[in-house]
Amino acid sequence: MEIVTVALIAIVFTTFLYLIVRESSPNGLPPGPKPWPIVGNLLQLGEKPHSQFAQLAETYGDLFTLKLGTQTVVVASTPLAASEVLKAHDRTLCGRYVFQSFRVKNHVENSIVWNECNETWKKLRKVCRTQLFTQKMIENQAEVREIKTMEMVKYLKKNEGIEVKIVEVIFGTLVNMFGNLIFSQDIFKLGDESSGSLEMKQHIWRMLELGNSANPGDYVPLLGSLDLFGQRKDVADCLQGVYGVWGAMLKERRIAKRQINGDTKNDFVDVLLDSGLDDQQINSLLLDMFSAGTETTASTIEWALTELTKNPQVTADIRSELLSVVGKRAVKESDILNLPYLQAFVKETLRLHPPTPLLIPRRALETCQVLNYTIPKECQIMVNAWGIGRDPKTWTDPLKFSPDRFLNSSIDFKGNDFELIPFGAGRRICPGVPPGNSVY
């Protein structure tokens, strides 16, 4: 009863606060639909907010404003608006808007995804840039990725005629790719539901669900500490479960390094241990890497397979190119540069099915002017990568799956072409773009 009473008091208080703030809100915000008291525009979002945002952009333009509870949110919906947010005003708009449920176990303070652009964040980015996502490291790991891919193919052939959950097989393969990059060993045995990877997948997917679900504390700050729906507890449980998957491996490696003649494998875990990072920083960094590099990639590959099924001519064109360039042998990563149609297919998949339809929310560190509108300090900024990829003003016949549109185009997805930003851009661009490119 106490929780209900506190919630009612908070809601009544927020109503009056909303009415006061609405009268004194800063002028010059981008246009947007009229908000309701307390809930703002929350009821207009539905289950696929990126789709609703794209519809709102047709009415309100490049930038529009929403009220999500008491939170002011500005949404960028065109390449021009994305360029302004992610490039022209990158430094001012590089703050992170962090969900209340994720503020557990000091994860945010040690996360390359959620932390502010402070010294810890810079240190973690530097480790990734200079030790993990280097051209040399990518090339050295090419053989491992090819081996794991062939293991997946053999597993699928072995189970021909038997129903398999393809996304789980892809996920397990990607986990093993990262497992070998980081720990020099597999984490997942394909087809073995008792292995640690299945538990990891469940925890990571649950965290992504929580990140995409409404939490009253995110929109009504007075409710933030109550955890009314148990989301913060769920995230804490997920973090504990994921950390447990590789916790024993980290402990074992630390012991080996302490021994005078300890046999260490000189992989990425050794790099992390030698870099002076503590266990919390290592755990958060590994979680960021596994969650960003496995589930989202598996989802994108699943969409790619779906498009192949729906578009037999595209499948035939890819097969023809492979036979012409590669022949009947297995495809190697070194072949990709000579497969322009396959590259175009990947870009088209990312255009229509970006791994993160709405880029991770940013926050304005200071008030600034964007496209002649005022973006107030602490405002949340979202970039609709899904909507930008389907913008009829940018793309001809935008809903048609057509890799041919990229054959004579220089547009790429590495953060310089704002028509295609599946991995973001600016200082917050996904640090794993190079290996992501290698995988798909």
From Swiss-Prot:
Key words of the record: Alkaloid metabolism, Heme, Iron, Membrane, Metal-binding, Monooxygenase, Oxidoreductase, Signal-anchor, Transmembrane, Transmembrane helix
Superkingdom, natural source: Eukaryota
EC top class, as a word: oxidoreductase
Transmembrane segments: 2-21
Gene Ontology BP terms: isoquinoline alkaloid biosynthetic process
Necessary cofactors: heme
EC id: 1.14.-.-
Principal location listed in the UniProt entry: membrane
GO cellular component: membrane
Gene Ontology molecular functions: heme binding; iron ion binding; monooxygenase activity; oxidoreductase activity, acting on paired donors, with incorporation or reduction of molecular oxygen
Family according to the record: Belongs to the cytochrome P450 family.
Protein name, per record: (S)-N-methylcoclaurine 3'-hydroxylase-like protein
Organism listed in the record: Papaver somniferum
Upper lineage: Eukaryota, Viridiplantae, Streptophyta, Embryophyta, Tracheophyta
